[in-house]
From Swiss-Prot:
Role description: Binds 16S rRNA, required for the assembly of 30S particles.
Example of a GO MF term: structural constituent of ribosome
Membership in a protein family: Belongs to the universal ribosomal protein uS14 family.
Protein name: Small ribosomal subunit protein uS14c
Alphabetized InterPro entries for the sequence: Ribosomal_uS14, Ribosomal_uS14_bac/plastid, Ribosomal_uS14_CS
Organism expressing this protein natively: Aethionema cordifolium
Cellular location(s): Plastid, Chloroplast
GO CC list: chloroplast; small ribosomal subunit
Superkingdom of this protein's organism: Eukaryota
Length: 100
C-alpha cells in the first residue's frame, strides 16, 4: 500500500492539471499559428507560468486499490499483483488465466 501522503499529492496534481489544462492547450495552439519567433518566445513564457505540478507529464496512473504507481494496467486501473489476485478469485468478469 502506498503512503497516504503520496496518494494525496497525486490527487493534488490531478486537480492542478485539470485547472490549467485549457491554458496550456490554448498557448500551444497559439504557438503553432504564429510565424514570428519573438512572439513565440512571449507565448512560451506564458506557457511556463502555470505551476510545475500542473503539467500532465508529472501524473502517474495509480492502482485504485493499493495506490501503487508502477505496473498499473490501464484497462483495469489495477496493479499487476492485485489484478492477478482478483482474476484468481473470479472477481473480474471476462478475464481468464492463460494456459497453453
Amino acid at each position: 500500500m502506498a503512503k497516504k501522503s503520496l496518494i494525496y499529492r497525486e490527487k493534488k496534481r490531478q486537480k492542478l492539471e485539470e485547472k490549467y489544462h485549457l491554458i496550456r492547450r490554448s498557448s500551444k495552439k497559439e504557438i503553432s499559428k504564429i510565424p514570428s519567433l519573438s512572439d513565440k518566445w512571449k507565448i512560451h513564457g506564458k506557457l511556463q507560468s502555470p505551476p510545475r505540478n500542473s503539467a500532465p507529464t508529472r501524473l502517474h496512473r495509480r492502482c485504485f486499490s493499493t495506490g501503487r504507481p508502477r505496473a498499473t494496467y490501464r484497462d483495469f486501473g489495477l496493479s499487476g499483483h492485485i489484478l492477478r489476485e482478483m482474476v484468481h478469485a473470479c472477481l473480474l468478469p471476462g478475464a481468464t488465466r492463460s494456459s497453453w
